[in-house]
C-alpha cells in the first residue's frame, strides 16, 4: 500500500472566529497552527500533505502559509472545496453559501490523495506530536478485511472546550477493546459553572462528562473511505435539499456513525499524550500563542519552524 498522506481541511469559513484563522499567525515567526501540524506530521513519517482550501482564499493562503511551506521538506499538494463541486444532476440551492461539510472536503481532495491511506485533520487545531506518531504507525499497517480498518485520535472533552463560547465535538462511545461503537456530532457544547453541557435547540441543555472521549476530526482511513463518501454523497444531498438546503453539512462523524451502524467499519480509538489547543474564537488565540511559545522554550520546536 502507498505511504500514508496527511489531509488538512483548511476551507472552512471561520464564522465563529471572525476571520481566516487558517492563516492567522500564532508562532514567533508568523507560523499558523497548520505549520506546526505539517512539522509534526513530517517528524512522524508523513512525506506528502494535501491542503484543502477554497479558491476564494487561495491568494491570501499562498502569500502566507503557502510561501512558508515551500521551505518545509514536506511535499505539498492543494485541493479546492467548492460549493458547485457536486455529482451530476445536482446544483447549488439558491442562497447557499455554507460549504457542504467535512466529508465533502475530503471528497474534493480525492485526486490529490490517490490510492493512499490518509490521516485527516483540521487546519486550526493543534493536535500534538504523539497524535501524528500513533496515527501514522496505525495507517502503515492498516488493512481492510471483513470490515474497513479505520482509526481516530481521541481527546478528553474537558481539555477541548473554551471559555469563550460554544464548540462542536463528536461525542464518542468506545468498547472495552478500544473500538468506537458510536459517535454523535454535538454542535453547541459549552462550559458552565457546574461542568459542561450541550443543547440542540438553544433552550434545553444536557450535561456531558468532562472525561468523555471526543473526536477533534483527526481521522485515519484506508483508501476505501473515499469510495464510501462518493457513494453516499447523493443520498445526503437528497435529504439535505429536502430538509435544510442552506445549512445541512455532510460531516465525517455522521458518515462514520452510519458505517458503524451498518457493521461495515471498525474504528480504533488511539490516544495522544499531548494536549490539544485550538482557536474556535479570536479570544482563544493568546492561550495558543503562549502554549506554542512554551513548547519552543522546552525544545519541542525550533524558534523558527522552517529556518
What function would you assign to each model-found segment?
Residues 1-11, 28-122, 127-132, 140-141:
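Conserved N-terminal catalytic core of the sugar/cofactor nucleotidyltransferase
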Residues 53, 220-221, 280:
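A conserved hydrophobic position in a structured secondary element of the catalytic/binding core
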Residues 60-61, 130, 228, 255, ...:
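Phosphate- and divalent-cation-binding pockets in alpha/beta enzyme and binding domains
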Residues 87-99, 165-170, 283-287:
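Short, surface-exposed amphipathic charged segments that create phosphate/polyanion-binding patches used
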Residues 129-218, 223:
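Conserved core of the sugar-phosphate nucleotidyltransferase
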Residues 213, 268-274:
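Catalytic beta-strand/loop signature of glycosyltransferases that borders the donor
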Residues 229-265:
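A C-terminal functional module that forms or caps the active site or interfaces directly
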Residues 284-307:
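Generic C-terminus detector
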Amino acid at each position: 500500500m502507498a505511504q500514508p498522506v496527511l489531509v488538512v481541511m483548511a476551507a472552512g469559513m471561520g464564522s465563529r472566529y471572525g476571520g481566516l484563522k487558517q492563516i492567522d499567525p500564532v508562532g514567533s515567526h508568523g507560523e499558523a497552527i497548520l505549520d506546526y501540524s505539517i512539522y509534526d506530521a513530517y517528524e512522524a513519517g508523513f512525506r506528502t500533505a494535501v491542503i484543502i482550501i477554497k479558491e476564494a482564499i487561495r491568494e491570501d493562503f499562498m502569500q502566507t502559509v503557502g510561501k512558508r511551506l515551500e521551505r518545509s521538506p514536506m511535499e505539498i499538494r492543494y485541493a479546492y472545496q467548492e460549493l458547485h463541486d457536486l455529482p451530476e444532476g445536482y446544483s447549488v440551492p439558491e442562497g447557499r453559501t455554507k460549504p457542504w461539510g467535512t466529508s465533502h472536503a475530503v471528497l474534493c481532495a480525492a485526486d490529490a490523495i490517490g490510492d493512499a491511506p490518509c490521516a485527516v485533520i483540521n487546519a486550526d487545531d493543534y493536535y500534538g506530536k504523539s497524535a501524528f506518531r500513533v496515527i501514522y504507525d496505525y495507517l502503515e499497517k492498516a488493512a481492510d478485511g471483513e470490515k474497513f480498518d479505520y482509526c481516530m485520535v481521541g481527546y478528553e472533552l474537558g481539555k477541548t472546550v473554551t471559555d469563550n463560547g460554544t464548540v462542536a465535538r463528536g461525542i464518542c462511545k468506545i468498547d472495552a477493546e478500544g473500538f468506537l461503537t458510536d459517535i454523535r456530532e454535538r454542535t453547541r457544547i459549552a462550559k458552565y459553572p457546574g461542568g459542561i453541557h450541550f443543547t440542540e435547540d438553544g433552550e434545553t441543555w444536557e450535561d456531558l462528562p468532562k472525561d468523555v472521549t471526543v473526536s477533534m476530526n483527526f481521522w485515519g482511513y484506508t483508501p476505501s473511505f473515499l469510495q464510501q463518501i462518493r457513494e453516499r454523497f447523493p443520498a445526503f444531498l437528497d435529504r439535505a435539499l429536502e430538509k435544510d438546503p442552506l445549512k445541512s453539512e455532510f460531516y465525517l462523524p455522521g458518515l462514520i456513525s452510519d458505517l458503524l451502524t451498518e457493521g461495515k467499519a471498525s474504528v480504533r480509538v488511539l490516544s495522544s499524550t499531548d494536549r490539544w489547543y485550538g482557536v474556535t474564537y479570536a479570544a482563544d488565540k493568546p492561550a495558543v500563542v503562549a502554549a506554542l511559545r512554551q513548547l519552543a522554550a522546552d525544545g519541542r520546536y525550533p524558534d523558527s519552524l522552517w529556518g
